[in-house]
């Protein structure tokens, strides 16, 4: 949604630059989607994020908005720009249609208004206000705290804030088309050497064996391959970028937990997982007795029914390092698609 809003805003006016705030990890991938925009690292609060973005602003005026207000119109943006000389901060406001209770008493709704975004401010004054270190719920409150003048323009009911899952359904009434329906496929491959030991972990199942696995984490190659397949399908890079093997934080890590984090990341970019297929390459141990337990573990991590997950195995006919028992490997394929918000709650099968 951030990308849709950014491109809509870019089409509304000749902005000097459009700055998008995100986490450090998100920005790396956001740039792949839209290199034409500027990016600022987010803070622990909206206010900290705003300060970080303002550090990149050198124009006399700055307009800021919540990325969750996807319905911001060109008319609202133009109203703000036309009024920029009237005050230090121009704010869109809507009248209250409902009765209001405040501290147990009925308030006069005619004296109240609903403030929204975008808000257009004098850059220098907004920066100065935020340096005070106090907490403000929006830009206008910060400007007012240093004596700045606030003026209002008519708000836009369509610029509501997407707060709850059900709010997504309102986008249909604004003419937003459902997301791309194409399916995206990813492929993953991983290998590990054996070492002295008495078990291996495959798809979260601990299996007795006459050897152990040489690895930074728990050496669960099928899960590492599946993570790569999911990241690849979403064009987010590979497992090493998210869980580097030189980071002590992941020393001995439970790969099933890494898979759950991988799923969280992929879903955070708007995707839902369709299915997964894993092939384990090894001479020993025998996989068949453990396939259903593996399948159950993977399905739970992906939030899929087990019939959307497949586990299979093959030997290398005594050829290569796998065939001679030096190690083992795994190949995984995953299919994903964009979550279709027009149909409501995400489908977990």
Show where each model-derived region lies.
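Short aromatic/hydrophobic "clamp" motif used to bind/position activated sugar donors
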Residues: 60-62
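Conserved core of the sugar-phosphate nucleotidyltransferase
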Residues: 71-153
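Glycine- and Gly-Pro-enriched alpha-helical subdomains that act as flexible
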Residues: 229-272
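Short, conserved loop-to-beta-strand elements that form functional interface hotspots
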Residues: 277-286, 290-322
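C-terminal edge-of-domain segments
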Residues: 324-344
